[in-house]
Amino acid sequence: MRTHMTANRKIYISDVTLRDGSHAIRHQYSVNDARRIAQALDEARVDSIEVAHGDGLQGSSFNYGFGAHTDLEWIHAVASVVKHAKIATLLLPGIGTVHDLKAAYDAGVRVVRVATHCTEADISRQHIECARELGMEAVGFLMMSHMTTAEVLAGQAKLMESYGATCCYVVDSGGALSMQDVRDRFRALKDVLKPETHTGMHAHHNLSLGVANSIVAVESGCDRVDASLAGMGAGAGNAPLEVFIAAAERMGWNHGTDLYKLMDAADDIVRPLQDRPVRVDRETLALGYAGVYSSFLRHSETAAAKYGLKTVDILVELGKRRMVGGQEDMIVDVALDLLRQRRSGAAAV
């Protein structure tokens, strides 16, 4: 395994407030919200700003929830104010197409993160190759990384690298990885990837480990860290950007951003937009404990309210069934099963 010094190495700061953060408000950012947040992030000198519906390009749908605007409207708004950061987006094969990718490129996107379930990297080939042909930076994004072993994950990252990905991410979509889990996965990735291929960490805060896991990732050779202002993201949110930067600053790491501007943006712009606090609570903790896809939270809360159930019960059952991103339609099925069980139990009494 190659070792890395962290003191002088520049950490690439990838903000996800305008993509993952969209989950926290059911994809209802206004164009003006996107513009204000992007301008604040750009002035704070983050390296990239990811913009899209929470479920990536063309995620706006019955299954995932309709966005207040189209992806291109958000992207154009961000492109109108950004001067330093690269504009990034997320694409899930099967939801977004190469046509959508080309349209995003024309709108100003220069980095695409092609996201698959952690054992399904083979479906990313077409989109990664298309991105490279367009001259975009292509990043492999292995979601729900807690659901497979470090060795299998490394093999999947190697596939993405072979398609042209120049960076591969460990994505803790369920916020379920421990610090040792993170260590093991980055060691495995670094053992098989080319020296020039970057690695990245995308954490969720469901077990309050978002910042800790990001720090461990960097200590294990990770080059890029995803984070969001005020932790704005699915479930209990992502690693809070301003908190990670404060910790990195105290550790003497080279992050290149303005901590105070990030703190102001988090509290003055982003936090007031939350219609449900982004925090660790009973429901979001259940996500991390059960290893459930973080964006299932709001859908599960809706189903629980509709059928008179506890959100936690739905989430834990989803974890038992090992549901993954893209299976949002199963949330209602699980709720109805739990309702039937409750009624049959009451009838038996």
Curated annotation (Swiss-Prot):
Binding site for Mn(2+): 20, 202, 204
Record EC number: 4.1.3.39
Organism annotation: Bordetella avium (strain 197N)
Annotated site, Transition state stabilizer, chain positions: 19
Residues involved in substrate binding: 19-20, 173, 202, 293
Keyword field contains tRNA-binding: no
The protein's enzyme class: lyase
Catalytic activity reported: (S)-4-hydroxy-2-oxopentanoate = acetaldehyde + pyruvate
Protein's name according to its UniProt entry: 4-hydroxy-2-oxovalerate aldolase
InterPro entries reported for this sequence: 2-IPM_HCS-like (IPR050073), 4OH_2_O-val_aldolase (IPR017629), Aldolase_TIM (IPR013785), DmpG_comm (IPR012425), DRE_TIM_HOA (IPR035685), PYR_CT (IPR000891)
Active-site positions on this chain: 23
CDD domains assigned: DRE_TIM_HOA
Keywords of the record: Aromatic hydrocarbons catabolism, Lyase, Manganese, Metal-binding
PROSITE patterns the record matches: PYR_CT
Pfam family, one: DmpG_comm
